[in-house]
């Protein structure tokens, strides 16, 4: 087609056609720039849109006139071997693509990169009619929108004439098998004529999370395996649940009760109650919509379903606990006798009794936690736990710890969480869900359809306030006082805001933490660190004062600063920077001005107080104008003012009470005391609420204690004196009004920061409510929500009017337990052991028996192992059993030898090796003997007294041969005792001479006398005995022993007759002062002299003078030489005496009238000459020795004159003094009373 066919078209018409077709125009990349359109001839038009193909590149036909008139271009255009696809213009302007764009925006062509055409899909079955390549090319060419310039159609068939006819036919089946997708499936393939696409395999998506560019969650996200399980809708798909351990009432679980006591049924309450019976549920409802009713109904049904399980209701404050108690009594009708209210005021013993008897408990979470940890409460018996104000269940709060403790021992319990605001962020709400093991959420907002009819209108008014002139003046003075400290802090690059009025507590704490973690803080010297810590501490406290000044008034600010000044001036150690602030002239000027203003009665420290008084007065005036009814007094309405600090609350109440009696204001604060005011205990809080409901008080100025959960009556006006960035607190405040009728909320906001904080809180609340309602951003714990009721049981609802028990209406007081006159026995401690655990010990002989096996009660018995008698046990090699030389050396080195050569042989510990020490309290330095040590010593002494005399020196169990004390010959004292001769017996009669017990002489005595003189005498002489002294004993005896010895020397005590069975008192062995604490009757009778005399002889008793105490110590065994008197041996064997006779220091001694007497003389031979020397003892062939067992090494001693020998007596050494110190010495007891 030639160009002459369009030569008669007018230019205007062509422009219109060009505009209509330009939106989808295709421009090849090799086109030259458009030339200015001009008219060539009378019927020809040249517009510059000449295709390159028409220039002869592809053989297009052209007329001869055009070739003649065309001028050669001076630019050479290079054409590539392959044609580059041209860019596609979607529209000439943005208005074509985006018609809604603004007209002032820059418009231009929008280029879109052409996409590659998708490959042709091969059909599995060839169709009978296949289009040829030429027809496809023609069809594709028709789809392309050409330019208005007509072009000639090119016939491609000329270029394809040489190709075979089957070049474009489908390939054979055996050649195109690879292109057909292979599907592997367990089900047979479907017969279909359509092409089957291969299934796209998805990679595992565990732990992945797809989000949008703006941080939102992408739709259709596959939950990871770590998240909670999906909600199964069919019973066959659900995981089997183990049966509960709680005892259920089979008849009661068939129905569940919904009370109709409060009037018409609310559908949302019914839905929430039904879901809360079978799932761990989080209920988020605006205040005043019946959360208390929902909790009471669920508690009632679990009280019916279980027979002995327990139900716990927890609330953070005591007023909230008492509020729920009344709801359960008046709505659910739970018997009062089965309920109790426990707090920290009751003793643990009283709470333990309540846990053992009652079933329903109203408690604070801290008390529940303590009772569970101490074993007072049994976690396995709890079936339902109700958590009020559940948004507190974050971090380490008591709610979290209680649920965690229950989960350790109890897998079957229900959790019901109640709150008005679940959290201030998505993370906080998720933490509450995880800590309380929530599986379902029921949330309603004020815009929800099913609660709109029960929510009254709330008018919210925001009042923006500017600071007063007084506040601006105080800011300037206080800023100048703090400016040097702020500059010093900024110089260290720890803080960057040089305006002191911008200080906040949070900002200071954050800056301090950041500086300490930075490199400058870590590398700083200790002096710099101390300076920075002091600066941060002072400015943090000043940040709180600035907040009081800006948002609460001059009064609270002055109270805080006055305490700061008193602390610095009073202690005189306030620190350098505190003194710098207090002593600055600006600070002093500021305090003087504030003091002058405070002294005025009509002074108002903040413009908020002015607006507050106007708002409250207008509200009461409007109420009196008839808004509350014609018969209602003006003060019948109620107002609550919320503030953050107690000082501010007291200032507000003071200003409001100036407008009495119309306004009767009272503060409502917590229980803790502050520096300037005391708190309100539970009784005062309840009394204030009662007066507020009754009308005695019509305005309450409350802190955060009044924000959560309290039902403080019908409130028509809420005034928020300060704003909070927490949406939870703001919503709790606003929920106090609009319950029974329309309410009004007034917000007093300072321009700037407080205004922005409120807007942030409002937006945050709305966003969180939408997220919780959708549930797409949270993960729920369906795996921990047990149904408790068997799945085969489907309880039916029973809507009825609950009859309140008579006991619930008679006593209006709270069910607090009273202290009993006589406390009961303390309950046994519970150790929270798992069920079925085997306590105590098992004998090794019964390990294989089935009698005590835990599985025996289930009918499972252990199969006894049968031994094959025919099979012999393998006999090991002898070398593998016995020890070789190397093993024996190792055994001797490790087990038989000890280093240092102390003891070569190591034996078993012998408890009888030190009997004296076991029966004696040894010396102590700083720590005295304990109760059990004294008891053991007393026990050993008593056992010693009960032992037979002849076995007292024998080791038990036959470790040593019995002693030969019974074979000692009769003492020659018997004849003299019977004769009672007035004169001393003759020395020639050896039978009448009593040989005193001998011991080794001292070294000095042995050196004095020569060896020739130290021989056995031919004539018996009265001699004094030698006593033993214990070197290791205490040098100073006890006071009791010294007094006893002194009495013996100064007086003569009558002695019993010889025929009497009475034995004289002996001396008490007292090695330390601790022995005085033993019992007075610890005296032991270890035997007498008669016990060692031949039993064939007539036994007599030696009456001795003096007094003594019975000794509880074992006898000391001495080595004696056989004595021969006048050539006649007293005994043919050694004489072994268990105790040494104590004699006084007399030179001659004899027995007169059955009593041993002593004569003192200054002259005479040395009495030491009568004793054998050590050489004589060594040379004696007939002398036999016995091992001497004594606790301490012996030493020499002397006798004191003028004292008669007494049994079991110790005396102390004295040189030449009759009244000297006595030496402790053991003597032979001459009493056969033990026989």
Curated annotation (Swiss-Prot):
Subcellular localization: Nucleus
EC number(s) per entry: 3.6.4.12
PROSITE patterns on file: DEAH_ATP_HELICASE, HELICASE_ATP_BIND_1, HELICASE_CTER
Domain Helicase ATP-binding residue range list: 272-440
Annotated catalysed reactions: ATP + H2O = ADP + phosphate + H(+)
GO biological process, one term: interstrand cross-link repair
Function: ATP-dependent DNA helicase involved in DNA damage repair by homologous recombination and in genome maintenance. Capable of unwinding D-loops. Plays a role in limiting crossover recombinants during mitotic DNA double-strand break (DSB) repair. Component of a FANCM-MHF complex which promotes gene conversion at blocked replication forks, probably by reversal of the stalled fork.
Acidic residues bias locations: 1075-1085
Keywords annotated in UniProt: ATP-binding, DNA damage, DNA repair, DNA-binding, Helicase, Hydrolase, Nucleotide-binding, Nucleus
Skewed-composition ranges (Basic residues): 1015-1027
SUPFAM superfamilies: P-loop containing nucleoside triphosphate hydrolases (SSF52540)
Superkingdom of origin organism: Eukaryota
Domain called Helicase C-terminal: residue spans: 608-784
Species of provenance: Sclerotinia sclerotiorum (strain ATCC 18683 / 1980 / Ss-1)
Top-tier EC class: hydrolase
Family recorded in the similarity comment: Belongs to the DEAD box helicase family. DEAH subfamily. FANCM sub-subfamily.
Main location per the UniProt record: nucleus
Binding site for ATP: 285-292
SMART domains with a match to the protein in the record: DEXDc, HELICc
Protein name: ATP-dependent DNA helicase mph1
GO cellular component, one term: nucleus
Biased composition (Low complexity): 1160-1170
Motif (DEAH box): 388-391
Residue spans of biased composition, Basic and acidic residues class: 61-72, 947-958, 1065-1074
Ranges for region Disordered: 20-78, 96-148, 808-827, 944-1117, 1144-1235
Pfam hit, one: Helicase_C
């Amino acid at each position: 087609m030639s160009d002459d066919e369009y030569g008669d078209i007018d230019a205007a018409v062509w422009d219109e056609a060009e505009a209509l077709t330009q939106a989808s125009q295709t421009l090849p990349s090799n086109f030259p720039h458009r030339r200015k359109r001009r008219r060539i001839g009378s019927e020809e038009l040249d517009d510059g849109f000449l295709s390159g193909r028409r220039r002869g590149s592809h053989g297009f036909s052209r007329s001869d006139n055009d070739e003649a008139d065309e001028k050669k271009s001076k630019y050479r255009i290079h054409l590539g071997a392959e044609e580059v696809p041209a860019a596609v213009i979607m529209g000439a302007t943005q208005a074509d693509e985006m018609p809604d764009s603004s007209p002032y925006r820059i418009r231009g062509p929008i280029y879109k990169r052409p996409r590659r055409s998708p490959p042709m899909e091969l059909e599995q079955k060839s169709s009978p009619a296949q289009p040829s390549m030429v027809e496809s090319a023609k069809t594709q060419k028709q789809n392309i929108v050409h330019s208005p310039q007509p072009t000639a159609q090119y016939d491609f068939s000329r270029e394809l004439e040489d190709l075979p006819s089957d070049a474009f036919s489908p390939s054979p089946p055996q050649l195109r098998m690879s292109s057909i997708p292979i599907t592997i499936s367990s089900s047979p393939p479907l017969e279909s004529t359509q092409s089957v696409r291969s299934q796209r395999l998805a990679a595992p998506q565990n732990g992945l999370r797809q989000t949008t560019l703006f941080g939102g969650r992408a739709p259709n996200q596959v939950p990871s395996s770590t998240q909670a399980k999906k909600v199964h809708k069919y019973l066959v798909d659900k995981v089997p649940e183990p049966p509960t351990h709680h005892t259920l009432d089979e008849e009661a679980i068939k129905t569940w009760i919904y009370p109709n006591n409060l009037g018409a049924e609310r559908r949302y309450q019914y839905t929430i109650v039904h879901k809360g019976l079978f799932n761990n549920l989080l209920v988020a409802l605006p205040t005043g919509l019946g959360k208390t009713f929902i909790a009471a109904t669920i508690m009632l049904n679990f009280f019916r379903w279980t027979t002995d399980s327990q139900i716990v209701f927890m609330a953070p404050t005591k007023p909230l606990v008492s509020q729920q108690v009344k709801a359960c009594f008046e709505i659910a009708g739970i018997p009062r006798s089965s309920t109790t209210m426990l707090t920290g005021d009751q003793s643990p013993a009283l709470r333990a009794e309540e846990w053992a008897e009652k079933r329903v408990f109203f408690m604070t979470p801290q008390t529940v936690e303590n009772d569970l940890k101490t074993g007072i409460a049994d976690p396995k018996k709890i079936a339902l736990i109700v958590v009020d104000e559940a948004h507190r269940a974050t971090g380490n709060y008591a709610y979290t710890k209680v649920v965690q403790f229950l989960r350790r021992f109890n897998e079957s319990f229900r959790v019901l969480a109640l709150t008005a605001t679940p959290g201030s962020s998505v993370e906080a709400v998720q933490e509450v869900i995880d800590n309380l093991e929530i599986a379902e959420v029921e949330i309603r907002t004020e815009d929800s359809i099913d609660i709109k009819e029960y929510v009254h209108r709330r008018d919210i008014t925001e009042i923006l306030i500017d600071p007063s002139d007084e506040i601006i003046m105080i800011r300037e003075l206080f800023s100048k006082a703090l400016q040097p400290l702020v500059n010093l802090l900024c110089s260290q690059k720890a803080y960057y805001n040089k305006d002191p009025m911008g200080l906040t507590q949070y900002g200071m704490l954050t800056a301090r933490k950041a500086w300490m973690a930075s490199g400058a803080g870590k590398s700083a010297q200790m002096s710099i660190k101390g300076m920075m810590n002091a600066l941060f501490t002072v400015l943090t406290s000043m940040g709180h004062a600035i907040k009081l000044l800006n948002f609460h008034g001059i009064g609270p600010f002055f109270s805080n600063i006055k305490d700061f000044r008193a602390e610095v001036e009073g202690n005189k150690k306030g620190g350098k920077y505190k003194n710098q602030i207090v002593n600055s002239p600006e600070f002093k000027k500021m305090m003087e001005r504030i003091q002058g203003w405070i002294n005025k009665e009509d002074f108002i420290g903040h413009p908020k107080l002015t607006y507050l008084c106007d708002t409250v007065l207008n509200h009461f005036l409007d109420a009196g104008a008839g808004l509350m009814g014609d018969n209602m007094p003006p003060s019948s309405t109620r107002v609550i003012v919320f503030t953050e600090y107690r000082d501010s609350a007291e200032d507000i109440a003071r200003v409001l009470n100036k407008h009495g009696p119309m306004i009767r204001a009272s503060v409502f604060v917590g229980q803790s005391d502050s520096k300037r005011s005391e708190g309100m205990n539970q009784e005062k809080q309840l009394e204030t609420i009662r007066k507020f409901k009754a009308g005695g008080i019509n305005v309450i100025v409350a802190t955060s204690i009044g924000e959560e959960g309290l039902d403080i009556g019908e409130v028509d006006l809420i005034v928020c004196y300060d704003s909070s960035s927490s949406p939870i607190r703001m919503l709790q405040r606003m929920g106090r009004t609009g319950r029974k009728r329309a309410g009004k909320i007034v917000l007093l906001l300072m321009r700037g920061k407080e205004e922005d904080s409120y807007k942030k809180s409002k937006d945050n609340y709305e966003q969180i409510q939408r997220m919780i309602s959708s549930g797409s951003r949270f993960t729920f714990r369906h795996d921990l929500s047990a149904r408790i009721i068997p799945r085969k049981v489907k309880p039916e609802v029973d809507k009825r009017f609950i009859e309140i028990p008579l006991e619930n209406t008679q006593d209006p007081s709270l069910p607090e337990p009273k202290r009993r006159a006589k406390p009961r026995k303390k309950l046994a401690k519970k150790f929270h052991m798992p069920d079925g655990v085997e306590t105590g010990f098992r004998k090794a002989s019964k390990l294989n028996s089935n009698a005590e096996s835990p599985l025996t009660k289930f009918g499972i018995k252990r199969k006894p192992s049968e031994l094959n008698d025919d099979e012999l046990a393998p006999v090991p090699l002898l070398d593998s059993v016995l020890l070789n030389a190397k093993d024996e050396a190792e055994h001797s080195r490790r087990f038989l030898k000890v280093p240092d050569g102390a003891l070569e042989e190591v034996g078993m510990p012998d408890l009888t090796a030190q009997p004296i020490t076991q029966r004696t309290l040894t010396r102590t330095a700083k720590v005295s003997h304990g109760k059990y040590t004294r008891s053991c010593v007393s026990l050993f002494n008593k056992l010693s007294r009960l032992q037979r005399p002849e076995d007292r020196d024998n080791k038990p169990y036959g470790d040593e041969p019995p002693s030969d004390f019974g074979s000692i010959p009769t003492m020659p004292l018997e004849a003299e005792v019977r004769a009672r001769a007035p004169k001393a017996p003759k020395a020639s009669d050896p039978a009448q001479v009593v040989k005193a017990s001998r011991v080794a002489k001292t070294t000095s005595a042995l050196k004095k006398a020569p060896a020739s003189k130290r021989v056995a005498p031919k004539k018996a002489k009265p001699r004094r005995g030698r006593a033993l002294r214990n070197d290791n004993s205490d040098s100073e005896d006890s006071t009791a022993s010294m007094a006893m010895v002194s009495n013996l020397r100064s007086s003569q005590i009558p002695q019993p007759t010889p025929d009497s069975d009475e034995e004289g008192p002996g001396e008490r062995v007292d090695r330390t002062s601790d022995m005085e604490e033993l019992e007075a009757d610890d005296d032991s009778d270890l035997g007498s002299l008669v016990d060692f005399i031949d039993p064939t002889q007539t036994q007599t008793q030696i009456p001795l003078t003096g007094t003594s105490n019975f000794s509880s110590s074992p006898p000391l065994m001495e080595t004696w030489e056989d004595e021969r008197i006048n050539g006649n041996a007293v005994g043919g064997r050694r004489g072994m005496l268990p105790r040494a006779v104590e004699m006084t220091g007399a030179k001659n001694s004899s027995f007169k009238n059955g009593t041993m007497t002593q004569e003192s003389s200054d002259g005479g031979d040395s009495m030491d000459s009568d004793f054998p020397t050590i050489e004589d003892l060594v040379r004696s062939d007939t002398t036999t020795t016995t091992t001497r067992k004594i606790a301490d090494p012996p030493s020499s001693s002397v006798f004191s004159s003028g004292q008669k020998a007494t049994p079991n007596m110790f005396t102390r050494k004295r040189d030449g003094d009759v009244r000297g110190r006595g030496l402790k010495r053991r003597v032979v007891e001459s009493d056969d009373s033990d026989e």
